[in-house]
Amino acid sequence: MPNIHDVEVRDLQVNADQRGHLVEVFRSDWDEYEIDPEMSYYSMTYPGVVRAWHRHLEGQIDHFVCPKGRITVGIYDDREDSPTQGELDTFVIGEHNQQVIRIPGDCWHGFKAIGDEPSLLINYPTNLYDYEDPDEERIPYDDDRIPYDWNAEIHG
């Protein structure tokens, strides 16, 4: 259950049979996608690699899904006008815990691939990526402004 204002989590239904499984990861009638995504991309990440921290200041909302492998997602709220300013949320998602996480883009966020295999993250952002002027502010994964240790023991 998320603590941060505007973060939402939806359990995804895994429809499995003897052939494998099928999982819906985007439906326009889901509340988490109240603003339709403008694009989609995937990121393959090797075990132990951290991709953090960044945020978007132009209103983008991200929607993370991890269909293969496992990742820890970290979200930190330092928005001055937020009722949850200073809160940190973490989630472990992946092939054995299929969820979509709605992330307000103006919160710092990132993820770490955990386990022994590469992880696949799919994102459905609400803004197109602008190669000439990216809407991204970045700080190192171990920046002291965010009270999170990516190497801490995983409980989930």
Curated annotation (Swiss-Prot):
Function: Epimerase involved in N-glycan biosynthetic pathway that takes place under low-salt conditions (1.75 M instead of 3.4 M). Participates in the formation of the tetrasaccharide present at 'Asn-532' of S-layer glycoprotein Csg, consisting of a sulfated hexose, 2 hexoses and rhamnose. Involved in the addition of final rhamnose (sugar 4) of the tetrasaccharide on the dolichol phosphate carrier.
UniProt entry tagged with the keyword Isomerase: yes
Pathway(s) per entry: Protein modification; protein glycosylation; Cell surface structure biogenesis; S-layer biogenesis
Gene inactivation effect: Impaired formation of the tetrasaccharide present at 'Asn-532' of S-layer glycoprotein Csg. No effect on 'Asn-47' and 'Asn-117' glycosylation of S-layer glycoprotein Csg.
One cellular component (GO) term of this entry: cytosol
Family: Belongs to the dTDP-4-dehydrorhamnose 3,5-epimerase family.
One Gene Ontology molecular-function label: dTDP-4-dehydrorhamnose 3,5-epimerase activity
Domain of life: Archaea
Keyword vocabulary terms for this entry: Isomerase
Native species: Haloferax volcanii (strain ATCC 29605 / DSM 3757 / JCM 8879 / NBRC 14742 / NCIMB 2012 / VKM B-1768 / DS2)
Sequence positions that bind substrate: R19, E24, M39, S40, Y41, R51, H54, H109
PANTHER family per UniProt: DTDP-6-DEOXY-D-GLUCOSE-3,5 EPIMERASE, THYMIDINE DIPHOSPHO-4-KETO-RHAMNOSE 3,5-EPIMERASE
Alphabetical GO biological process terms: polysaccharide biosynthetic process; protein glycosylation; S-layer organization
Catalytic activity, EC: 5.1.3.-
EC category name: isomerase
Gene designation per UniProt: agl13
InterPro entries: RmlC-like, RmlC-like_jellyroll, RmlC_Cupin_sf
Protein name: Probable low-salt glycan biosynthesis epimerase Agl13
